[in-house]
Amino acid sequence: MPDWYKKWQNVSHIYKLPASFPKMTAKEFVENFKLEKDSLLKEFTNIESHTEVQNLIQSMKLNEEQSKILKQILSSTLRDTFYTILLGLDGCSAIGKSQELYEIKDENGNLISGEIEGYAYEYFHEME
C-alpha cells in the first residue's frame, strides 16, 4: 500500500460525505444552468475581468450605447445557447445532427431528464 494512501486513510474520517446526497430536481438542474449563464455574462461584461471575451470587447473601444447593445447581444446568445442545450438534453431539440432523449441522473442515480423543457422555458424566457 503506498505511503500517500496510508496517510489519507488516517485523515479520511475528517472528510466524511453523507451516505446519500439530496435528490437534484430538473428545476435545480435548470437553475444551475441559468446561474452559469448569468455568471458568464457578468464575467464577459466586467471591465475588471481578464477573460478573452472582455479583452476583445475592450479592443473595440465601444461607446456606452454600443456597450449596452453588445451586452444585450451576449445575453441573447448565451440564453439561446443554454436553452438549446437544455432542450437537446431533454430530447426536445437537436444537438448538432442528432435529436434524442439523454438520461441525466444526479449522484444518487435519480433521473433528472424528462422535465427540463418546461423549467428551461421558464428560466430562460419568462424570467429574462
Per-segment meaning from a language model:
Residues 2-6, 17, 21-22, 34, ...:
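Polybasic, proline/glycine-rich intrinsically disordered low-complexity segments
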Residues 29, 33, 37-40, 53-57, ...:
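Generic structural signal of hydrophobic/aromatic residues within well-ordered alpha-helices
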Residues 42, 47, 51, 80, ...:
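Generic alpha-helical propensity signal that fires on short helical segments
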Residues 64-116:
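Amphipathic protein-protein interaction modules
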Residues 1-66, 95-97:
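N-terminal low-complexity, intrinsically disordered segments
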